[in-house]
Swiss-Prot record:
Binding site for Zn(2+) 4: C287, C290, H302, C306
Positions that bind Zn(2+) 3: C224, C227, H239, C243
Biased composition (Low complexity): 138-147
Positions contributing to Zn(2+) 2 binding: C168, C171, H183, C187
Name of the protein described by the UniProt record: Zinc finger protein 474
Cofactor dependency: Zn(2+)
KW NADP (keyword) present: no
Family matches, as Pfam families: zf-C2HC_2
Biased composition (Basic residues): 1-10
Leader sequence residues: none
Residues annotated as binding Zn(2+) 1: C97, C100, H112, C116
Zinc finger (C2HC/C3H-type) boundaries: 93-122, 164-193, 220-249, 283-312
Length: 364
């Protein structure tokens, strides 16, 4: 009986070991299974004592097993995830330039500062004397521990750059000196009248213009004496021969009565007013209908669309400057008015004929 019970118990344990999903191992440890219970549960194996020979069944050999639960593996994984790896900073912090206030890398700030300081000296020398500023000094900021702090250094550099800005007299906003002139053109203070003129406003603006005009002014233009268009002083000598050749070709195409003499180049005056004069006045022709002035080649184009006088070609050919011609035109107009009956007379005569009262008065 006892032997049958032991076999059933061992078979059940083997079935549970085979059906379980976890890897299972059995070891003979003190405190887990006693020697009697272990021998009763697994009759095929015997307890192992050091110094004795191992006696096992040659038909069924089974290694010692250890039971590992899932909970222990989860604890090991969770313990390894408690300390994540430290990711270093991707790039160093920016440094603020104490002259212009812009940000640069720690390597490029050393290259930028000498160039920025040189540019500052050039712009400061162009300003008027009352707008010139002292050379900015590089701030040296120390932390409480006596070491340099990047944040404190950047803050001091930014304050140094902001100290170079000039306030606007109207709105109070701050600008760089070269940008202040551009702002003055469009500055409209709110709720205030026109701003008070500067004591030396003309000198002030002139000085700012000279200081801030980094680009050269527009070159002076000269007007061509043939076509009247504006050209630069360097391009005008190239244009005039071509324009004169073109003028000759267009003049040859005109009718004989509209031919113009060759335009003469005006002599330069000492006050340099010749550059502002238009084309030669000898080239201009009056329209006989509307008295507008055109060049000879444009007059033909204008006459196609010119609205002639409503009284016809007789009035156009009439010389209004002579008194006889004007009287003749006035007398002819009066005769036409007398000969032609008015519309009212026609209506009255038609009504009288309908009533059978010729020559009678119409009573209304």
């Amino acid at each position: 009986m006892e032997r049958g019970k032991k076999k059933r118990i061992s078979n059940k344990l083997q079935q549970t070991f085979h059906h379980s999903k976890e890897p299972t191992f059995l070891i003979n440890q003190a405190g887990l299974l006693s020697s009697d219970s272990y021998s009763s549960l697994s009759p095929e194996t015997e307890s192992v004592n050091p110094g004795e020979n191992i006696k096992t069944d040659t038909q069924k050999k089974r290694p010692g097993t250890v039971i590992l639960s899932k909970l222990s593996s989860r604890r090991i994984i969770s313990e390894s995830q408690l300390s994540p790896p430290v990711i270093p900073a991707r790039r160093p912090g920016f440094r603020v330039c104490y002259i212009c206030g812009r940000e640069f890398g720690s390597q490029s700030i050393a290259i930028h500062e000498p160039q920025c300081l040189q540019k500052w000296h050039i712009e400061n020398s162009k300003l008027p004397k009352h707008l010139r500023r002292p050379e900015p000094s590089k701030p040296q900021s120390l932390s409480s521990s006596g070491s340099y702090s990047l944040q404190a250094t950047n803050e001091a550099a930014f304050q140094s750059a902001q100290a170079q800005l000039l306030p606007c007299e109207s709105c109070g906003r701050t600008f760089l000196p070269d940008h202040l002139l551009v702002h003055h053109r469009s500055c409209k203070p709110k709720g205030e009248g026109p701003r008070a003129p500067h004591s030396n406003s003309s000198d002030h603006l002139t000085g700012l213009k000279k200081a801030c005009s980094g680009t050269p002014a527009r070159p002076r233009t000269v007007i061509c004496y043939i076509c009247g268009k504006e050209f630069g002083t360097l391009s005008l000598p190239i244009h005039e021969p071509k324009c004169l050749e073109k003028w000759k070709m267009e003049n040859d195409r005109l009718p004989v009565e509209l031919h113009q003499p060759l335009p003469q180049k005006p002599q330069p005056l000492p006050n340099a007013q010749s550059s502002q004069a238009g084309p030669n006045q000898a080239q201009l022709v009056f329209c006989p209908h509307c008295s507008r002035i055109f060049t000879s080649d444009r007059l033909l184009v204008h006459q196609r669309s010119c609205k002639t006088h409503p009284y016809g070609p007789k009035y156009q050919n009439l010389n209004l400057g002579s008194k006889g011609g004007l009287k003749e035109y006035t007398n002819s107009k009066q005769q036409r008015n007398r000969a032609a009956p008015s519309v009212t007379d026609k209506v009255i005569h038609a009504t009288q004929d309908a009533l059978g009262e010729p020559g009678g008065a119409l009573c209304l």
